[in-house]
Amino acid sequence: MPRVTVTLGLALLWSGSIHAQSLQAGAWSSNGSAAGYVMEANGRATDPDGATVSLQSQNAAAGTFGSAGSSLVADAIKGRRVSVSAELQTRGVGTGASLWLRIDRNATMLMMDNGVDRPVRGDSEWTRYSVSLPVPDDATMIVFGVLLRGTGRVVARNIRVEAGSPLTPGGPLADPAREVLEAAIAIVKQNALRRDEVPWTTVEPRVRAYAAGAQTSADVYPAIRYLLSELGDHHSFLSPPSQTTALRTGSVRNLDPEVRSMSDGVGYVMVPGYQGWEPSALRVYAGQFHQLLDTVRASVECGWIIDLRQDVGGNMWPMLAGLKPFLGDAALGTFESLSKSSPPWRAGAGVGVQPSSSLAVLESAWVAVLTGPRTASSGEAVTIAFRGRPRTRSFGLPTAGLSTSNGTFALPDGAALLLTTAVEADRTGRRYGDKIEPDQLVENDPAKGDPAIEAATQWLRASSTCRAGAK
């Protein structure tokens, strides 16, 4: 079982950042991972002509997203399937645009489909798009909208919400659907970190009821997502076959790390998230990371800033391999499951790229680590890797709170469960599993530039005294 600390699970949470309780029924609200998106909305999805919504990025990075959302009370649609449909027009969309749909019970998400596994990209003319989910009898709200990831513009017109036929209680499942559902339930029961906290006598019958009548494996995905939501770890998720294939083949688009020397003699390293498991791509990433460090190293006299504030997660191993010059061969942490501790994990494990000897000096360099609310999952694993390192201090804001580890479990149809199976512990044995507080809290204040970088720079210059050892 590959162990990958991932945050593709954030794809399930993105649109969940719009809270149904904050919306007036039928009204539209915008949200996202960062500033830089503009929303325009007209009409309601229940109007005869539907609604029209546009989202446009303005100076948005490839790893960010903008979301528009609306909601309806679920009372009139309980016990039926609900569909949200629209026509999408895109311009210059690099990462993807889609519709999303979420079913809530009070303040808890029951199930969701955000369409990230079937994005509309590039320039397209009025592509028909729809998402559909069953509405359980205990649902209270239906939340839905438009999602734009990365750069570009999307217009969704004729957005409509429609109730379908009643769900068939106890309807038989076709073999492909049954095989996937049974495999998912068994995997969760045997491996989930919080499996003992699930009221199985209540939850399992609901899962099977939500999957009733399913004919294809995709038809049971909403039921599986509901099951994962009942774990309450906020990190487990289902990766459909197309998304799983993209991760395994290295076809996911990733941002490059940024390495540069600042004017005050401090080195700056920005580590973004990294999605993918393909071995040769991991080696290329780590090797290029080392080359960037080697190019800048000689001009750095006062220590280094490792900026993890945009590290939304993915695969922790190439990130640690790229940062191995700072981390060396030390034991950095462990994965703590219900029954055992993993062997200590180390930088470079599973990637197979060693930094050049010219970078050995960085192992004793002064390092300031920056964190924030978008530092998530594998970004938090990297944060933990620096805990207990000499000459190191962290600055900024608390992390996202996903400092747990996911194992990858294949399903019969090519999909995969990325299931939370352990919490993470640092080299001193301290266990996490929630938000990680920085050593020095620094609030964001755009009017004052970047206070976290300023605080980190002041500490580096005072601590390292800009000696040769700071390199």
Name every feature range the model reports, one short phrase each.
Residues 21-172:
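Extracellular and organelle-lumenal recognition/adhesion modules and their flexible linkers in secreted
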Residues 184, 227, 269, 306, ...:
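Terminal peptide-recognition signature
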Residues 261-286:
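STAS-typified acidic loop motif
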Residues 264-266, 299-304, 329-332, 363-367, ...:
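Loop/turn elements at helix/coil->beta-strand transitions in domains of secreted/extracellular proteins
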Residues 269, 292-313, 369-370:
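Short acidic catalytic loops
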